[in-house]
UniProtKB/Swiss-Prot annotation:
Ranges per topology, Cytoplasmic: 1-86, 108-162
Name by which UniProt lists this protein: Caveolin-2
Membrane protein topology class: Peripheral membrane protein
Phylogenetic placement of the source organism: Eukaryota, Metazoa, Chordata, Craniata, Vertebrata
Chief location: nucleus
Keywords for this protein: Cell membrane, Cytoplasm, Golgi apparatus, Membrane, Nucleus, Phosphoprotein
Length: 162
């Protein structure tokens, strides 16, 4: 419905002074803490989560809302995404990190102390099991399959058109 032909670019700017990066506590040695400017996803594990407003909400050329509605909805989308992410990470990041640590520690322990010794034991015993399996296959399974194959090879089918 808007009459403007140029695409509007909406950006949200926040000054560093308007919000706090931490809880307001003064730490004794700030060099011990992670710099918030560094890349926290160096291996690009979550590159698929970089969604913008246009990736989620898109209006075709034939149906446009008013420009002010588009700008306000874009701003509300960005603000709500920012605020909700911060809110959820405050309450979920520490418990989920704790649970993930327990899970990975348990899986590592199982892999190191149970799975790998079992696999190594199987690989040590495997040559003798392979010899026994080959003998069973040659003595029982191969003659059975051969006789079944010979029985079915003598079967012939004829189709008649009635």
């Amino acid at each position: 419905m808007g009459l403007e032909t140029e695409k509007a670019d909406v950006q949200l700017f926040m000054d560093d002074d308007s919000y706090s990066h931490h809880s307001g506590l003064e730490y004794a040695d700030p060099e011990k803490f992670v710099d918030s400017g560094q890349d926290r996803d160096p291996h690009r594990l979550n590159s698929h989560l970089k969604l913008g407003f246009e990736d989620v909400i898109a209006e075709p050329v034939t149906t446009h809302s008013f420009d002010k509605v588009w700008i306000c909805s874009h701003a509300l989308f960005e603000i709500s995404k920012y605020v909700m992410y911060k809110f959820l990470t405050v309450f979920l990041s520490i418990p989920l990190a704790f649970l993930a640590g327990i899970l990975f520690a348990t899986l590592s322990c199982l892999h190191i102390w149970i799975i790998m010794p079992f696999v190594k034991t199987c690989l040590m015993v495997l040559p003798s099991v392979q010899t026994i399996w080959k003998s069973v296959t040659d003595a029982i399974i191969a003659p059975l399959c051969t006789s079944i194959g010979r029985s079915f090879s003598s079967v012939s089918l004829q189709l008649s058109h009635d």
